Swiss-Prot record:
Lineage of the species this protein comes from: Eukaryota, Viridiplantae, Chlorophyta, core chlorophytes, Trebouxiophyceae
Name of the protein in its database record: Small ribosomal subunit protein uS7c
Biological-process GO terms, alphabetical: translation
Name of the encoding gene: rps7
Gene Ontology molecular function: any one: rRNA binding
Superkingdom of origin organism: Eukaryota
Physiological role: One of the primary rRNA binding proteins, it binds directly to 16S rRNA where it nucleates assembly of the head domain of the 30S subunit.
Amino acid sequence: MKNLIKNKIKLSTYNITLIEHFIRFLIKGWKKKKAINLLSLSLNYIALTINKDPISTLEMAVRYTIPVYLEVTPSIITNENKTLWHKRFICKSSKVRTFQAIKWIIKAAKEKKDKSLYIHLAKEIVDASRNSGKAVKYKEQMENKLKLAQLHM
């Protein structure tokens, strides 16, 4: 813990919107300083354990967990006598897909209970940057649901 505080990465030096989005999703029920501290501790943990740039691993993690372009939504088609349920495929914007990837990474880190959250967040970011982990499994589950919906159209 002492090494993490001594070698603290200052998030203010990185003017990246991805970090701001991570802080925004971590801030629920907390103060902003706690969310910034949690993210900086997890980035320091990444820098100490894998000896790579933590910002680039964060970007790779989000890139690997971004879901596909399409989303299945039900829509109603009404004729003269009948109402039919029809599946529509809607394209998501890149911003929404990035938000979904960040939510999946944070959700996968919060599901683990044995250690502190910054360690779980760091490990999940590293796993997602290696294209494995729970966040990538969430993405694969969503892709499988989309394929099943396309088959049943």
